[in-house]
């Protein structure tokens, strides 16, 4: 959903920041999410085999009873191998019915789909998520970059990155804007990817 853009004839490009709340308010976010999943899988099939696609799932979409069949269907109709699909969920998706959530994540993972925890460090952050759920990637929120040139924020960011890496997860830091930030987060080797 984060790359979703609407080219409005009068307003120009409308960003997901504006689209998503309207879709949620109108009860369209699940249908929109399903369309995005299918479209993303089909588009990824046009790309080189080494390239994968990450698709954000809203909490409403993730908690649909048919989420597993929707993912299977998108993979089947597109022909995309499951290992080329990464599903990004936020911490709010992990808050409700944790046993069922764990089961769904485990089944997605057994299909070969990769699971990422997006925007880690905001909202209801809990280190227990890193331990209790079958995640493969943690995406540390851009807010951790604020004041990164001083010791305390950098130590916190590196600590979360090291902990995640030690648990066998890939680590992404979101919101990288300068070479200095990239150098600071890359220094100890825990961060595997940077997202600008």
Describe each PLM feature range:
Residues 15, 66-68, 100-101, 126, ...:
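Residues at alpha-helix caps and immediate loop-helix transition turns in enzyme cores, especially N-
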Residues 1-3, 26-101, 116, 175:
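Catalytic core of bacterial c-di-GMP phosphodiesterases, primarily the EAL and HD-GYP domains
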Residues 32-35, 152-159:
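Conserved acetyl-CoA-binding loop-helix of GNAT-fold acetyltransferases
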Residues 9-11, 46, 107, 178:
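Flexible loop/coil segments at beta-strand boundaries within sensory signal-transduction domains
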Residues 8-13, 37-41, 119, 196:
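Short acidic-capped amphipathic helix/loop micro-motif used as an active-site/signal-coupling element
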Residues 6-11, 61-62, 148-150:
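Catalytic strand-loop-helix junctions within cyclic-nucleotide turnover domains
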Residues 3-4, 74-148, 161-196:
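The catalytic core of metal-dependent phosphodiesterases that act on cyclic dinucleotides
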């Amino acid at each position: 959903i984060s790359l979703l853009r609407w080219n409005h004839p009068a307003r120009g490009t409308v960003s997901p920041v504006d689209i998503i709340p309207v879709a949620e308010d109108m009860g369209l976010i699940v249908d929109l999410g399903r369309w995005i999943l299918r479209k993303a899988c089909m588009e990824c099939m046009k790309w080189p085999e080494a390239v994968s696609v990450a698709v954000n799932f809203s909490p409403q979409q993730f908690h649909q009873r048919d989420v597993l069949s929707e993912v299977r269907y998108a993979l089947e109709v597109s022909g995309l191998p499951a290992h080329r699909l990464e599903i990004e969920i936020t911490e709010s998706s992990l808050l409700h019915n944790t046993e069922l959530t764990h089961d769904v994540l485990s089944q997605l993972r057994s299909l070969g789909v990769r699971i990422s925890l997006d925007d880690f460090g905001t909202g209801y952050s809990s280190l227990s998520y890193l331990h209790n759920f079958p995640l493969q990637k943690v995406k540390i929120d851009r807010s951790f970059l604020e004041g990164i040139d001083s010791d305390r924020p950098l130590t916190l960011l590196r600590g979360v990155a090291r902990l995640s890496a030690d648990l066998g997860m890939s680590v992404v830091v979101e919101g990288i804007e300068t070479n200095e930030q990239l150098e600071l987060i890359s220094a100890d080797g825990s961060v595997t990817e940077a997202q600008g």
